[in-house]
């Protein structure tokens, strides 16, 4: 009986984990590690020194929460190890020494980071084999393509990644440090201007929920602002956990507008549409046409209604007039990185690509640069 490889997509905001060959991840939980703020007074109550994921989230009142992945890149390896441990033993309930593990990484991830991931998998978890794949490339595979440009926008970072025949083109990858977490913060700010106060980490989670349920991208921002000012047709109400009902109006589209106008957040960078265009312009003339007609959206921050139409409109005005532009926004794009990993990990042709424990023992962590690219 073939052993199912494990697929773990470690995002800045959520960790997605499951088995290769499945069509969706078994476990999706926040990439959070929480530690008690005070020494526990309840001795012997089985209080742990750290909590991961949903449990950390539900006890957030008494914990200080840390995200070990910032802007898509692991910055705290001790906490990262806790997240992986939790993934294998508590969420998937598997023994990592019995399964090959496919991990994902951000584009342009530092070399030292890939090596560290590799050594933790083999030395801490004793995996028989592992592989590290670039997130955006997996999203493209999940859409059934090998050439295209992926706009991957999650909780911690956004990237535009041009891919030609299965290989990312590193010189043309652009990173934008503007993603879901920034949009949540921005929504907290503009709701505060409306007179609602959201300040604590616990309240931030409420605002994130408001964002996910009520926000959308306007096709024409100025028009939408005028509509919102002259009528209440765009207003929606939202019930807070304490029963208070708040009204949200133009905040619904002002929040994600920051993706197109980062100046809203006080950032000097260009929006996602222009970043995408700039990425394409860094590529060879001959492949641009293929990129323009295969623009694939991926990640949770591309889930806003209206985002594909707006991208199409903005890119049409930037690109040469005869250019055919196609934005692909798969309904499952929140998990398309994981789905791509599941597809890759279950291909028979992929099985010789794994880095084995034996190869690691012979060559050390640098093997990852030779086998995963």
Swiss-Prot record:
Its main location: cytoplasm. GO terms for cellular component: cytoplasm; cytoskeleton. Its EC number is 3.6.4.-. The keyword Repeat does not apply. The keyword ATP-binding applies. It catalyses: ATP + H2O = ADP + phosphate + H(+). PROSITE patterns: ACTINS_1, ACTINS_2, ACTINS_ACT_LIKE. One of its GO terms (molecular function) is hydrolase activity. SMART domains: ACTIN (SM00268). It is an enzyme of class 3 (hydrolase). Pfam families: Actin. Keywords: ATP-binding, Cytoplasm, Cytoskeleton, Hydrolase, Nucleotide-binding. It is found in: Cytoplasm, Cytoskeleton. Actins are highly conserved proteins that are involved in various types of cell motility and are ubiquitously expressed in all eukaryotic cells. Belongs to the actin family. This is Actin-6.
């Amino acid at each position: 009986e073939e052993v199912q490889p494990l697929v773990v997509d470690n995002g800045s905001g959520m960790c997605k984990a499951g088995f290769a060959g499945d069509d969706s991840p078994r476990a999706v939980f926040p990439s959070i590690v929480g530690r008690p703020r005070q020494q526990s007074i309840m001795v012997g109550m089985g209080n742990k020194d750290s909590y991961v994921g949903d449990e950390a989230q539900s006890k957030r009142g008494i914990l200080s929460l840390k995200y070990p992945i910032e802007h898509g890149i692991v910055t705290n390896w001790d906490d990262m190890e806790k997240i992986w441990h939790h993934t294998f033993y508590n969420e998937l309930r598997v023994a990592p020494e019995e399964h090959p593990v496919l991990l994902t990484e951000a584009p342009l991830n530092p070399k030292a980071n890939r090596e560290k991931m590799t050594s933790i998998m083999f030395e801490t978890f004793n995996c028989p084999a592992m592989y590290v794949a670039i997130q955006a490339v997996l999203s493209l595979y999940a859409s059934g393509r090998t050439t295209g440009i992926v706009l991957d926008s999650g909780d911690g970072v956004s990237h535009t990644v041009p891919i030609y025949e299965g290989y990312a083109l590193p010189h043309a990858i652009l990173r934008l440090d503007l993603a879901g977490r920034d949009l949540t913060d921005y929504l907290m700010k503009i709701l505060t201007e409306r007179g609602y106060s959201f300040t604590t980490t616990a309240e931030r989670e409420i605002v994130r929920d408001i964002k996910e349920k009520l926000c959308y991208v306007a096709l024409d921002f100025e028009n939408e602002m005028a509509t919102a000012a002259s009528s209440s047709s765009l207003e929606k109400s939202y019930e807070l956990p304490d029963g208070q009902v708040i009204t949200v109006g133009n905040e619904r589209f002002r929040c994600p507008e920051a993706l197109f106008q980062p100046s809203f957040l006080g950032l000097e960078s260009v929006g996602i549409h222009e970043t995408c265009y700039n990425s394409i312009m860094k590529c060879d003339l001959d492949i641009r046409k293929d990129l323009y007609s295969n623009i694939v959206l991926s990640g949770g921050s591309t889930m806003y209604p209206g985002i594909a139409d707006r991208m199409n409109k903005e890119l049409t005005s930037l690109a040469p007039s005869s250019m055919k532009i196609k934005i692909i926004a798969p309904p499952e794009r929140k998990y398309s990185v994981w789905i791509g990993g599941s597809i890759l990990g279950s291909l028979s042709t992929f099985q010789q690509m794994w880095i084995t424990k034996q190869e690691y023992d012979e060559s050390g962590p640098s093997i990852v640069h030779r086998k995963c690219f």
